[in-house]
Amino acid sequence: MTIKQTHSFQTEVSQLLHLMIHSLYSNKEIFLRELISNASDAVDKLKFKSLSDDTLIEGKEALQIHIDVNKDANTITITDNGIGMSEVEVNKNIGTIANSGTKKFLKSLNETQAQDSNLIGQFGVGFYSSFIVSDKVEIITRKAGSKSKKGTKWASTGKGKYSIESIDRPDFGTSVILHIKKDEKEFLDDYRLRNIISKYSDHITVPIMMVKVSEDNKDIEYERINKANAFWAQDKQDLKQKDYDEFYKSLTYDLEAPLTQLHNRVEGNIDYTSLLFIPSKSPFDIWEPKRKGGIKLYAKRVFIMEDNEALMPLYLRFVKGVIDTADLSLNLSREILQDNKVIKAIRKASVKRILSVLEKMAKNKPEDYATFWQEFGMLMKEGVVEDTINKDKIAKLLRFTTNKSKNATQTVTLEHYIKNIQKDQKAIYYITAETYETAKGSPHLENFNQKNIEVLLLSDRVDEWMVSNFREFDGIQLKSIAKGNLEDFDSKEEKKAKEEVAKNFEIVIEKMQKILDSQVKEIKISSRLSESPSCLVADENEMGGNMERIMKSLGQDIPDTKPILEINPTHSLVKKLKTKIDEDLVKVLFDQAVLSEGGQLKDPAEFVKRINKLIN
């Protein structure tokens, strides 16, 4: 490129800039945190790449971040001698947002949510926070290893367009030049900037340098502002909870302190240090398939990578922290890392340690565990299926609400359920539904409520998948009360009475079957109902109604099966059918059963007509 070219910002970038400028006015200082974080990443990348290509680092200059203030020009310049960017990378990374998850996030973000500056850092678009305090921003950069001494200059006022041109730049790395707005000159104050660095970036491992203030102002000498140490390498005996909380916040951009942390130094066959945090709040993008992981991997304090499932199983993706080992080759590729014996051993030990801490929390700090479960319970339900090695440990950490619970809060353990099981009960019973209210009001529960049998009410979006794969606990089978035949809790007298009733309804059932033949597989007398007239049941090995609805919502094909309609012979509506088979009433009984399990009618208007007709 030899001439300046002008481009328009991508729509999402313009939206982001608008949100930042108008919504982050109460926390403007975060611009420096974001730019220092980007500079630190650039230095870490150069360190890593230079391990396999020492020509990338020119000369013996220390890798640092410099912050320079020019009050006459109203500028702040943040310079790093990290990896730098090529012209192609500038075009790709600045002015556009390629990540689909980020685009989706921006589309849903409103101005109130945008006031949470940590969302900006978590999504990796923090550079644009520069425009909160600047009316013009310039980037001058040159890629490390580039044979040409030419660099790339990017410039914008943040008003819809930006320019790119080629310029001379003898050194590799990146400089970000902020032209500070007239009403933001407080950020040109040396003391103010040092305070911001101390607040947000003290634990950045790259030295952050500023000009040392001297009395004669003649000699320009730089001094390090941040501690620039590996926080996790410190002895935990020397650290206070406040220190951990501050490091956690600087690492994760979380405003809240973590629930707890695990700080361990392991020496033996494998030497490593791990500092892992369990957050108190779930990130908003926890269900994004391509979200970044929370564990950073270091080898001898050299940053290697993050966002690698080799470091932590998917169900523990909420865990944040650092793992640093001396027993890892520094030139491992991401692919090789997956099968590395050292990483596998560290991962196994870390998972065991995390589950142990959660177990102790549940026992000794139930309020903290209740907070954890509310935020991350669904992920633990993933884990009981995915982690076959630790399945039993995870199962003991699960919490549920039941038909005996006062509300939807999940507090009941499987151990508690078994302890209070009925004398002749052979299964752990559950029902799945789209909502807690639908589960709680399900007609399938009626006989269980009457006989004081506890039933798990499952309405989390992972529950159907969990019970399809997690089928027994402590030797006792988990069984849906909306599927197949149930064990009989009736007395001999009750059984005999029901058998007599069933015989009296044989002709009624035959006639009902003809009317509903295209909609149901079978009609039979129910052992589940005591108050409602009807309910739908699936065969033992077939998909239930709730699972069918979930699959349909995901656009998945489902097997062409029909449910079983169960009727309650003691209900007045069903008794009417013994006198006369009313086709409208039969169809209403079926539609009512569909609605009671949270389903949707194919023709609601026709249902209303039938109801009105029956009422009249």
Swiss-Prot record:
**Assigned GO CC terms:** cytoplasm
Q: Which InterPro entries match?
A: HATPase_C_sf, Heat_shock_protein_90_CS, HSP90_C, Hsp90_fam, Hsp90_N, Ribosomal_Su5_D2-typ_SF
Give the chief site where it resides. Answer: cytoplasm
Q: Which superkingdom, per the lineage?
A: Bacteria
Q: Which Pfam families match?
A: HATPase_c_3, HSP90
Q: By its UniProt entry, which SMART domains does this protein fall under?
A: HATPase_c
Where in or outside the cell is it found? Cytoplasm
MF terms (GO), sorted A to Z: ATP binding; ATP hydrolysis activity; ATP-dependent protein folding chaperone; unfolded protein binding
Return the annotated region ranges for B: 335-549
Q: Where is the signal peptide?
A: none
Q: Where is this region: A?
A: 1-334
Region C, annotated ranges: 550-616
Keywords in UniProt for this one?
ATP-binding, Chaperone, Cytoplasm, Nucleotide-binding, Stress response
Is-annotated flag, keyword Ligase?
no
> What does the record note on quaternary structure?
Homodimer.
Q: What does this protein do?
A: Molecular chaperone. Has ATPase activity.
Family membership noted in the UniProt record:
Belongs to the heat shock protein 90 family.
What HAMAP family does the record tag this protein with? HSP90 (MF_00505)
Protein name per Swiss-Prot or TrEMBL: Chaperone protein HtpG
Upper classification of the organism = Bacteria, Pseudomonadati, Pseudomonadota, Gammaproteobacteria, Candidatus Pseudothioglobaceae
